Regions:
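Compositionally biased terminal segments of proteins
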Residues: 1-176
Length: 176
């Protein structure tokens, strides 16, 4: 079992990973790691991330870093689970530059939709924190979701009605 990740461990991981970046790279943090950097959590079990462009050097470095620091690292993005919401790239928030590595929060609206779809207690707490800090506006999330709804066929595991209900509940409109 690997130890949970606090802010100092996350920063140390990112700084070491940046040493392997040989070209300008955008690293998108999502899930608990994003919440941790926002100050909305004190720890996370995993460092969930994705990067562009993909790099063999960074992938190799991540494997050795996760063993050396005894952390869980997952290459994952909310768009693996829900459709990318329109304009998602424009809503990714720059966090820091470490050498050639630009660290960003993945679009908080797509993150929130992914967490609503999963529906775990911790996910719902994360969504409430994003709303409470005014990072995500529930009405805007519903609008963006409506625009992306036609892409749900690409995600057979999603129950469109349940996801719509979860979004409506967040807005305060219970259609159940």
């Amino acid at each position: 079992m690997r130890a949970s990740v606090d802010l100092s461990r996350l920063r140390a991981f990112l700084e070491e990973l940046a040493r392997a970046a040989r070209e300008p790279t955008r690293l998108y943090l999502t899930g608990g790691a994003s919440q941790l950097l926002r100050g909305l959590r004190e720890s996370t079990l995993d460092i969930d991330l994705t990067f562009e462009p993909e790099s063999d050097e960074l992938l190799r470095s991540m494997v050795s870093l996760k063993e050396w620091q005894s952390v869980n690292v997952e290459i994952v993005s909310p768009v693996h689970f829900v459709p990318a919401l329109p304009g998602w790239r424009d809503r990714c928030e720059f966090v820091m530059q470490i050498g050639k590595l630009a660290v960003l929060h993945f679009d908080p609206y797509t993150q929130a939709l992914s967490k609503l779809e999963r529906g775990h207690v911790r996910d719902m707490q994360d969504v409430q924190a994003l709303v409470g800090e005014r990072i995500v506006d529930p009405v805007r999330l519903r609008t963006l979701f409506a625009e992306a709804r036609s892409e749900l066929f690409r995600y057979p595991a999603i129950d469109p009605k349940s996801l719509s209900t979860a979004v409506d509940r967040l807005v305060g409109v219970d259609k159940a």
